[in-house]
A protein has these predicted regions:
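SAM-dependent methyltransferase catalytic region
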Residues: 118, 122-204
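Intrinsically disordered, low-complexity boundary segments flanking structured domains
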Residues: 8-17, 93-96, 140-150, 199
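Conserved S-adenosyl-L-methionine
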Residues: 62-142
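Class I S-adenosyl-L-methionine
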Residues: 1-77, 99, 110-115, 151
């Protein structure tokens, strides 16, 4: 029998009401309200952070992409594996404010160390994520200041996790001493670990 090869292309498009919306292949301000990197720089400028990034993404880009896949759902998690300046966080908070949604974000960024001669280093920052944290803080405060009626309804808080050594002790599998095995079973967490550290490590 001859093998049969199927070349399947699956497209997933969002529904708006009872109709399918096919996103445009071209992202532009006139087509779908998406700005350029120049606008991204101006957004950082209002926080005094524009000199640290050459080509920051505008929040309108992330907002458009997020809305494209979360149109009728208000409790999603948006994951950004190359978070850079933290645009995704600000865009999701803006969307939550505009559409009364409760979307959350997870930003992942390597702790890229700043050059000692860079503006960011001279201003006290040591890594890219440190600048992004500042931006997210300021962006959340700005949204609340511009929308005082929201009060505590809009969640602008976030947690920061850094890659670190495990809280679980390394077990010596070659140990012959029964006492060592019993001690490990009794307390297999590092001495300086807190209950919260352990819970988060197990969760993540």
């Amino acid at each position: 029998a001859l093998p049969i090869f199927l070349d399947l292309l699956v497209n997933i498009f969002p529904l708006q009401g009872d109709r399918v919306v096919i996103p445009s292949d071209i992202l532009s301000n006139s087509e779908n309200g998406v700005d350029t990197n120049e606008r991204g720089r101006k957004e950082l400028e209002q926080y005094g952070l524009d000199k640290y990034f050459d080509f920051p993404k505008p929040t309108s880009l992330i907002s458009y992409l997020a809305n494209m896949v979360t149109y009728d759902s208000k409790d999603n998690i948006i994951l950004d594996f190359f978070s850079g300046s933290g645009t995704t966080a600000e865009a999701i908070m803006i969307n939550n404010q505009e559409y009364s949604s409760n979307n959350k974000f997870i930003l992942v960024q390597l702790p890229e160390v700043l050059d000692v001669n860079s503006d960011g280093y001279k201003d006290g920052y040591r890594t890219i994520p440190e600048i992004a944290e500042k931006r997210i803080d300021l962006a959340g405060d700005k949204i609340i200041a511009e929308n005082p009626l929201l009060g505590g309804q809009l969640d602008i808080g976030f947690k920061v996790f850094e890659l670190d050594k495990s809280n679980v002790k390394k077990r010596n599998t070659e140990a012959q001493d029964i006492v060592q095995h019993l001690e490990f079973i009794e307390d297999n967490f590092e001495q300086n670990s807190t209950p919260l550290d352990v819970v988060y490590e197990i969760m993540l």
